[in-house]
Amino acid sequence: MSHESVWNSRPRTYGKGSRSCRVCTHSAGLIRKYGLNICRQCFREKANDIGFTKHR
């Protein structure tokens, strides 16, 4: 069995491997709250555009 035939050999329908950022398709550091599905790096860039404000 070659590497190509083993890679993605099963469908990813649940778990961390099935989800990715809707902006950059990165899968780590994903913010899923409120249905955002954005990685934390993209969230920091787009937070003001989405409507989030920083409280201090």
Curated annotation (Swiss-Prot):
<dbReference type="Pfam" id="PF00253">
    <property type="entry name" value="Ribosomal_S14"/>
</dbReference>
<feature type="binding site">
    <location>
        <position position="21"/>
    </location>
    <ligand>
        <name>Zn(2+)</name>
    </ligand>
</feature>
<dbReference type="InterPro" id="IPR039744">
    <property type="entry name" value="RIbosomal_uS14_euk_arc"/>
</dbReference>
<comment type="subunit">
    <text>Component of the small ribosomal subunit (SSU). Mature N.crassa ribosomes consist of a small (40S) and a large (60S) subunit. The 40S small subunit contains 1 molecule of ribosomal RNA (18S rRNA) and at least 32 different proteins. The large 60S subunit contains 3 rRNA molecules (26S, 5.8S and 5S rRNA) and at least 42 different proteins.</text>
</comment>
<keyword id="KW-0963">Cytoplasm</keyword>
<keyword id="KW-0862">Zinc</keyword>
<keyword id="KW-0479">Metal-binding</keyword>
<dbReference type="InterPro" id="IPR018271">
    <property type="entry name" value="Ribosomal_uS14_CS"/>
</dbReference>
<comment type="function">
    <text>Component of the ribosome, a large ribonucleoprotein complex responsible for the synthesis of proteins in the cell. The small ribosomal subunit (SSU) binds messenger RNAs (mRNAs) and translates the encoded message by selecting cognate aminoacyl-transfer RNA (tRNA) molecules. The large subunit (LSU) contains the ribosomal catalytic site termed the peptidyl transferase center (PTC), which catalyzes the formation of peptide bonds, thereby polymerizing the amino acids delivered by tRNAs into a polypeptide chain.</text>
</comment>
<dbReference type="GO" id="GO:0002181">
    <property type="term" value="P:cytoplasmic translation"/>
</dbReference>
<dbReference type="InterPro" id="IPR001209">
    <property type="entry name" value="Ribosomal_uS14"/>
</dbReference>
<dbReference type="GO" id="GO:0003735">
    <property type="term" value="F:structural constituent of ribosome"/>
</dbReference>
<comment type="similarity">
    <text>Belongs to the universal ribosomal protein uS14 family.</text>
</comment>
<dbReference type="GO" id="GO:0008270">
    <property type="term" value="F:zinc ion binding"/>
</dbReference>
<keyword id="KW-0689">Ribosomal protein</keyword>
<protein>
    <recommendedName>
        <fullName>Small ribosomal subunit protein uS14</fullName>
    </recommendedName>
</protein>
<keyword id="KW-0687">Ribonucleoprotein</keyword>
<dbReference type="GO" id="GO:0022627">
    <property type="term" value="C:cytosolic small ribosomal subunit"/>
</dbReference>
<feature type="binding site">
    <location>
        <position position="42"/>
    </location>
    <ligand>
        <name>Zn(2+)</name>
    </ligand>
</feature>
<dbReference type="InterPro" id="IPR043140">
    <property type="entry name" value="Ribosomal_uS14_sf"/>
</dbReference>
<feature type="binding site">
    <location>
        <position position="24"/>
    </location>
    <ligand>
        <name>Zn(2+)</name>
    </ligand>
</feature>
<feature type="binding site">
    <location>
        <position position="39"/>
    </location>
    <ligand>
        <name>Zn(2+)</name>
    </ligand>
</feature>
